[in-house]
């Protein structure tokens, strides 16, 4: 018998949930409604696979709407929102109290809408036999206490550990500092930032002693029609909360293990809004949290924030009956 866990979610398809209020020009010059018009919004680049999917379905459902993502870092995306360059930013944190108070003080309407749960994935080259790692070892690597694979596994001959992030100002870096290191800075000479998540994957694929840190939505990138993103050179590492990592106590960033808490590195994806008129930025953000948007998120491999979700064990026979 082989036991396989599945995540089942009760989410129903729905049509576009928002009704246009017309194109009458307002005093602020805006003509967009919650289902029509054209806007640009900011998004952390690490969420580009799921954002591209959501954009395509939203525009198909609301043919008079055009939403254009600006893929950037978490820091730059939030700053764009604070400077009123965009009214929507998709990222992995809520407003800080200082940011919220600033926007409220300028008669704005800041809102943080939870959209999905994402696992912070660790990837390594398939030549690395250490595909299981403990939370404590990840902390030691990020803090610089460990710089060689032999410090993690005495039998390893891979030499120095090189850690690659997608961007020095990305949400992945923020998560590691705030959630893994407890606010302490990353202090390892062998850590560097690439240009984006795709570059991280390519670097790890050609570097046997590397670890890449990316969002788990890249594990199921449907934009990669050639199916080359997840090639045989890449392994998704399993992470254990215990002192010693084994295949039996370590978990990958998949939906079931995000839901039941076994995978330790989980973050919430938010839509940060500053749209007091509740126009197209508001409409797109709330489409994502609607049943149809949550179904898209579920099918992408992320964990929805809304809907009834259950884990069921299913017995599968190795031999047909």
Predicted regions and their residues:
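Exported/periplasmic ABC-transporter solute-binding proteins
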Residues: 4, 21-66, 70-75, 79-82, ...
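Sec-dependent bacterial lipoprotein signal peptides
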Residues: 1-19
């Amino acid at each position: 018998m082989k036991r396989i866990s599945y995540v089942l979610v009760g989410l129903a398809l729905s049509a576009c949930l928002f009704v246009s209020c017309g194109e009458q020009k307002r005093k602020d010059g805006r003509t967009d409604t919650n289902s029509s018009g054209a806007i640009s919004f900011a998004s952390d680049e690490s969420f580009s696979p799921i954002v591209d999917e959501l954009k395509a379905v939203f525009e198909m459902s609301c043919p008079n709407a055009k939403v254009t993502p600006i893929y950037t870092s978490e820091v730059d995306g939030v700053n764009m929102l604070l400077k009123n360059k965009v009214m929507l930013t998709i990222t992995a944190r809520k407003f800080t109290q200082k940011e919220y108070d600033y926007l409220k003080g300028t008669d704005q309407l800041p809102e943080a809408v939870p959209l999905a749960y994402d696992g912070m994935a660790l990837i390594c080259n398939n030549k690395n036999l250490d595909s299981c790692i403990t939370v404590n070892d990840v902390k030691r690597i990020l803090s610089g206490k460990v710089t060689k694979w032999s410090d993690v596994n005495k039998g390893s001959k891979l030499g120095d550990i090189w850690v690659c992030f997608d961007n020095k100002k990305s949400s992945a870096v923020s998560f590691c500092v705030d959630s893994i290191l407890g606010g302490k800075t990353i202090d390892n000479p062998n850590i560097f930032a690439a240009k984006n998540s795709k570059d991280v994957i390519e670097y790890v694929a050609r570097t046997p002693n590397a670890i890449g840190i990316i969002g788990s939505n890249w594990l199921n990138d449907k934009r990669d029609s050639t199916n080359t993103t997840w090639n045989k050179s890449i392994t998704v590492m399993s992470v254990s909360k215990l002192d010693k990592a084994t295949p039996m106590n370590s978990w990958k960033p998949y939906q079931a293990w995000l839901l039941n808490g076994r995978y330790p590195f989980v973050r919430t994806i938010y839509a940060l809004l500053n749209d007091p008129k509740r126009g197209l930025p508001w409409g797109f953000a709330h489409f994502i949290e609607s049943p149809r948007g949550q179904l898209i998120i579920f099918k992408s491999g992320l964990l929805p924030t809304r809907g009834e979700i259950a884990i069921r064990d299913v017995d599968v026979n190795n031999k047909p009956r």
